[in-house]
Amino acid sequence: VQATIPLMPADFEELLSQMLQDGRKQLWLMTAMIGFYGLREGEICLLDVDENGDVYVGGELKRDVRALQSGAEKEERLALGLDLKGQPGEARRVAQLFRSGQIGLPKAVKNQIDKVSERNSYREVGAAYAQILKRYKPWQELVKRNPGLRPYGLRHGWAWRAHKYSSRPLHYSQAAAFMGHSVETHLKYYSSWVNRKELEEAGKKYNEALQSA
């Protein structure tokens, strides 16, 4: 398991602000969507944003695109926007901007999205984004300050905020559902951020249920 290094809230805010100052609006939009909603990079091409600004991720990153398109296996999950302090409603505002199509995505990412159906894979979409981000100087500065930080740190940062940022943290089962993975996977990566009482309670309930079965 690679080290789980989150992009911390202050760094996330600074990165977004710098992207706007640098006129990198498309990079800003994609980075904001991934960071505010805890997405896998490739999921950017699976999003369905409704008129209220609610964000749904269509299915998982499956190889069989035809199954996805037919709806046979398509299970949308709701993604939760976690705001930054002092920016109420910003996640939803970003989602509505994404839905409007006013800004669009970086060209290299769009090129890969166009090839998704022939490749039956979304992996290159995420790789194209990661490459752009890694070449961006302010990101390189963040990596210097946080050795081991990767683009996936945007998603890890969402998990950190879910558990450590608010006085009312999400339960780990809720966070796992919003991130689109199992509770086991969630705890494998993020257990050190999860409320210890919750974990103890879960263990106790499990053992009680076992005895009463």
Positions of PLM-derived features:
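Short, cationic motifs built from Arg/Lys/His that form the positively charged side of catalytic pockets
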Residues: 26, 39-40, 74-80, 155
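Ca2+-coordinating acidic residues in Ca2+-binding motifs
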Residues: 43, 158, 189
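Basic, Lys/Arg- and aromatic-enriched nucleic-acid-binding interface segment
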Residues: 2-41, 45
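Short, basic (Lys/Arg/His-rich) helix/loop patches that form interaction surfaces
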Residues: 21, 37, 111, 118-177, ...
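Catalytic-site neighborhood detector that most strongly recognizes the C-terminal catalytic loop/helix
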Residues: 6, 61-64, 179-204
